């Protein structure tokens, strides 16, 4: 639960916070296709974890901030296939926004995630970066909305929509 830009409470049940004024947005996640990547023979060597970039999002009214990205690493011989496959899932963030381009994205410390935790990407793998669904939460927090219900990474909305049904062959 976020109030005036600050996380004030962590909850597993939010039903009592909803009323007829509540508006919801469900944001897709690249985590949705992780299982399919492994099934296709494209297992991530590392990830996912989240890093904050220096790339500004297009501001709209009080909403402004930088993009967060999800990082995964893959063996170099899998990168083109992973890129092509994930491009068919635009509602799950689609293709990566970059490969091995942390400096271009404004990521200063290659091995520290958004929460300040160290991580290690295996040597000889390529880092791929996807736009991350935590970005809207960051931007909304910076707007200091009086009240917002958000998710915590790793604790997102789960639906009965099969990931395979999100595949768009013409993308």
For each of these PLM feature ranges, what is it?
Residues 120-171:
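C-terminal functional extensions of proteins
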Residues 1-119, 149-150, 155:
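Conserved mixed alpha/beta catalytic, RNA-binding, or beta-rich assembly cores of soluble enzyme
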């Amino acid at each position: 639960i976020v109030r005036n830009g600050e996380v004030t409470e962590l909850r597993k049940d939010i039903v009592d916070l909803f009323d007829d004024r509540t508006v919801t947005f469900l944001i897709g996640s690249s985590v949705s296709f992780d299982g399919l990547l492994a099934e296709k023979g494209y297992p991530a060597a590392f990830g996912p974890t989240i890093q904050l970039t220096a790339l500004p999002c297009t501001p709209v009214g009080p909403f402004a901030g930088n993009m967060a990205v999800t990082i995964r690493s893959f063996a170099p011989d899998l990168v083109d296939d992973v890129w092509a496959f994930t491009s068919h899932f635009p509602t799950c963030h689609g293709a990566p926004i970059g490969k091995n381009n942390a400096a271009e994205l404004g990521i200063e410390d290659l091995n520290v995630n958004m929460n300040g935790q160290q991580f290690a990407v295996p040597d000889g793998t390529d880092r791929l970066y996807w736009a991350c669904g935590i970005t809207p939460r960051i931007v909304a927090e910076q707007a200091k909305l009086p009240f917002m219900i958000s998710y915590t990474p790793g604790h997102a909305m789960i639906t009965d929509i099969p990931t395979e049904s999100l595949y768009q062959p013409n993308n």
